[in-house]
Amino acid sequence: GDEIVISILEHHSNILPWQMIAKLKKATLKYMYVNNEGIISDEEIQTKITPKTKIVSITQVSNVLGVATPLKAIIKKAHEVGAIAIVDGAQGAPHMATDVQDLDCDFYAFSGHKMLAPMGIGVLYGKKSILEQMPPFLRGGEMIETVSEQDATFAPLPEKFEAGTPNVSGAIALKAAIEYINQVGFSYIEQQEEKLMKIAMEELSKLPYITIYGSPDYKKHKGVLSFNIQDIHPHDVSSLVDYHGNIALRAGNHCAHPLLKYLNAQSTNRISFYFYNTKEDVYQFIEQIKKVRSYLGYDV
């Protein structure tokens, strides 16, 4: 039967739709797995994507490990077997320059709220030739040319897929956010994030009770770093650094249950940096992490 291929790195939003489609179409959902650093090997790409593959959907950057996936190799292999290649760019678009033509992906999606825009707005890029073949998935006002009592003809792209009243304020805000990010420039964004990540990883690595997930190379963490403190639940860690240091850590499974299970971690702490963060922010974070165990009576 037909197969859909994703990776173990995926956010639930790039797992659940494919589980649903696999059940509806009686297809098989397959996973590409990663090594200890979160890297998908070329062997895994060549083995999992086969002539049975119809869809390959892959994250650009893991929202847990921060690792970038080998998109070009995956997309090339998908096209070799006649499959559609879809990229989840939610964690990639804010942190790295992306050229969808250069990638040659068939679809690319990202959300606004990871790149300085409000929640409830995002972007879906699709190749025109594919979008023209697709029927509208949602029907309503503004996506038609004509309507009769029994039938309708649909508007051309992109209106065909934009039924109902759009999130106008969200779209205006997303445009402003994208323009601002482009003004700052991705070369600066990447340099600043690397500087901050280098300090964070070097300092955390000095602490014997810290486990860092993903690559030991700070350059391979695109804006996010997941870690755990021995014997202390991430929810306690995040609450303590918030209360004592006004630091916002994400604690939990990061909407990536399969990956956390694969990493043998129930949950993790995740710190994320962006270009507006400073070295002082990182050192303040490190100082709070050093105090967490003493807050709970360890090492006293």
Where are these regions (language model features)?
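Pyridoxal 5′-phosphate
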Residues: G1-V300
